[in-house]
Amino acid sequence: QMVCGDGVEYLRAMEPAQLIYIDPARRDEHGARTYAIEDCTPDALALRDLLLAKARYVMIKLSPMLDWRKAVDDFAGTVAEVHIVSTGNECKELLLVLDGKAAGATSAVAAADTRAPHVYCVNDDQRLDYDAAAYTRGLRIGDAPLPHELRYLDEPNASIMKAGCFDVVEARFGAVQIGPSSHLFV
């Protein structure tokens, strides 16, 4: 079924669904790019409760320029998954999956600190995923001593860089970050 009309009006009138996918326009009325969620059309933050009242899951495509942690905070405890998608080592998409059941949809603000999302970093055929709660509290970056024998210098792919999950890289791959202000590993 194809419906031509105002998407927000359709959202208000539609029957409940399992999933709603929303790709807000990231250009203003003058054609300039916008990055903040509330500057996009429609404003997914303003529609959060309505979206979650109409679907168990809501997938929102956002600007890859956004700080995903702030976006998660902005959606106040409703974000179950963060997908950072890159191709050719260039970050292309930031997708948030909201779960209405997890936050109760009516008391999302009360649930804000009760759960952290699962983060998926994808770059072509490379994938790294982790539970944000396990790795983003008290990040320690570049604390480990460097190994005596240095054979490789590694730079994470764009999705991992965007996620900022350098402690996950250290834990999963036995790599050591060369310094607190560096994103290079040995």
Indicate where each model-derived feature is located.
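Class I S-adenosyl-L-methionine
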Residues: 21, 26-186
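S-adenosyl-L-methionine
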Residues: 1-21
